[in-house]
């Protein structure tokens, strides 16, 4: 089954105009009774980032392995409600890491979406950027070859340059090289994250757009549905803003931070506790 982006409603832009001011998110576990009461009266739909949300932040991207007990929690939750992973990782990569056919996967910030029946979405404008990303990746690999610790990770529709293992003195050079590549190609743009610079298509498509599209495509954009999004990074803020007045956003952070999310979970352990509680209170069981 192939789902085309043309199905997105024409007024989708309106979804993003009522942005929530950035405030300190409240503790989710402290507010759990109220959150669960909302789940009892509405159909639940859960959307989750991967890195830093389902797995702890690690030094190298390939080390972010999903724990067996977290996978089991996701599998149980997917029997109760729609569960989707919305990740900056390439679709095939994140799907392989999670390893559950019962989930929906949105990779590359939503440029690639895979549903449980085998359908795949490629944003209709995304294909033209693939060779640009590949060219940028090769250029940065060459320019940064002598920088110890840097990891250039091509992801089809995006490119991540990880500098977590780079010495502080070399980080400005890494950023300068990324900036130079982006400046040379106006169809690309740079975004940031946790110890990473990302090169992405310069178009209005991100996790927030992907979340909005998924809600519509899955017939979950209804008043009786409670969409929940959990994420830990800058790119997840777009999704949090989509759920203002529509659902609940949860940022994963060890200390209070400014966020468009309403609630905060300390770490992946609290994420697991939260998902387990949602599983036991989800409305109905999927066929």
Report the location of each language-model feature.
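Conserved acidic, metal-coordinating active-site core of Asp-based
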Residues: 139, 147-229, 234-243, 247, ...
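Non-catalytic pre-domain segments flanking phosphatase-related domains
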Residues: 1-50, 54, 58, 69, ...
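Mg2+-dependent phosphoryl-transfer enzymes with acidic/Ser/Thr/Gly-rich catalytic loops
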Residues: 16, 21-29, 41, 120, ...
């Amino acid at each position: 089954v192939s789902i085309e982006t043309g199905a997105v409603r024409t007024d989708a832009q309106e979804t993003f105009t009522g942005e929530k001011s950035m405030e300190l998110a409240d503790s989710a576990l402290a507010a759990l009774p109220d959150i669960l009461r909302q789940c009892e009266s509405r159909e639940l739909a859960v959307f989750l980032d991967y890195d830093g949300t389902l797995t702890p932040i690690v030094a190298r991207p390939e080390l972010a392995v999903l724990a067996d007990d977290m996978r089991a929690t996701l599998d149980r939750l997917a029997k109760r409600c729609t569960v989707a992973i919305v990740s900056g990782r390439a679709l095939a990569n994140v799907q392989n890491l999670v390893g559950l056919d019962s989930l929906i996967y949105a990779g590359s910030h939503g440029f690639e979406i895979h549903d449980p029946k085998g359908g795949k979405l490629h944003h209709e404008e995304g294909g033209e950027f693939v060779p640009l990303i590949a060219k940028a990746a090769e250029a940065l690999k060459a320019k940064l070859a002598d920088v110890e610790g840097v990891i250039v990770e091509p992801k089809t529709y995006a490119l991540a340059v990880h500098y977590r293992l780079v010495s502080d003195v070399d980080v400005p050079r890494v950023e300068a090289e990324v900036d130079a590549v982006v400046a040379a190609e106006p169809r690309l743009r740079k975004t940031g994250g946790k110890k990473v610079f990302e090169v992405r298509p310069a178009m209005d498509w991100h996790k927030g757009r992907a979340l909005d599209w998924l809600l519509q495509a899955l017939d979950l954009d209804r008043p009786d549905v409670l969409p929940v999004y959990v994420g830990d990074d800058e790119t997840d803020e777009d999704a949090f803003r989509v759920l203002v007045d529509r659902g609940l956003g949860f940022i994963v952070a060890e200390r209070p931070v400014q966020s468009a999310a309403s609630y905060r979970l300390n770490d992946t352990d609290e994420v697991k506790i939260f998902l387990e509680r949602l599983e036991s209170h989800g409305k109905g069981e999927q066929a």
